[in-house]
Amino acid sequence: MSLEKIINDAWEIKDQISPSSDQKLKDAINQIIADLDSGKVRAAEKVNGQWIAHQHIKKAIMLSFRIYPMENLNGPYSSWYDKAHLLKGKTAGWSKEDHEKAGFRMVPNSPVRKGSFVGKNAVLM
């Protein structure tokens, strides 16, 4: 079954989706988030001068909020309470080399969620 079908089928029963949902669905959602993070896919893109929204990608993002619980996050400047699955992933644990390889700059306390593609030479504030 394709990722798109898994996501579209789950969307039809979105009110029933929870952290205890099927692992196949979680894997599909996580794969789409990883593909967004790497820039492999986009939620929307311009094709022949027209913007095309990929609905199953948007649905996967929304469903991800249903399969993960709220969490408390503590950092050096503040603490947060949110769906941490997307906050902990983009640069958590990165080394200096990882940041240099990614090619973008993040000033302190600038969040970027997992699933957000950040292009080279960007400065996040």
Question: What are these regions, as identified by a protein language model?
Answer:
Residues 1-104:
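Terminal amphipathic alpha-helical/low-complexity segments used for targeting or macromolecular assembly
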